[in-house]
Amino acid sequence: MRILGLDVGTKTVGVAISDEMGWTAQGLETIKINEEREIFGFDRVSELVKQYNVDKIVVGLPKNMNGTIGPRGEACQRYAESLRELLQLEVILWDERLSTMAAERLLISADVSRKKRKQVVDKMAAVVILQGYLDSK
């Protein structure tokens, strides 16, 4: 059983995958999207689901620090619902507050250059989201 973790932004979707035991998450890739042109990367997510035999998807849900859900969170909820309908899989929304900051800190502590951090931060945020979910189980 593998789980896909997604960090959905306005321009990219960071992707992480669990190991088969569901213990660890590792970064997979970053999918370019364009919300304004309604290009959401669903085809690529579908390919990854098939390639890795995924049976569950965890989508990061950005909440405000007071627990409310703003416009970005609502967009992630719509994204998750679209995936659920398209792929007929369980899609879980997971509180992702501060996941991008945590990913950024991890990359800085690993002495990753600013240019490289920009390229991988979304993928690392997906790892932080998915690992948080896996650790809760």
UniProtKB/Swiss-Prot annotation:
Gene3D superfamilies: YqgF/RNase H-like domain (3.30.420.140)
Transmembrane helix found in the keyword field: no
EC top class, as a word: hydrolase
BP term (GO), one: rRNA 5'-end processing
MF GO annotations: nuclease activity
CDD domains named among the record's database cross-references: YqgF (cd16964)
Predominant location: cytoplasm
Subcellular localization(s) per the UniProt record: Cytoplasm
Pfam families: RuvX
Role according to the record: Could be a nuclease involved in processing of the 5'-end of pre-16S rRNA.
UniProt name for this protein: Putative pre-16S rRNA nuclease
EC assignment: 3.1.-.-
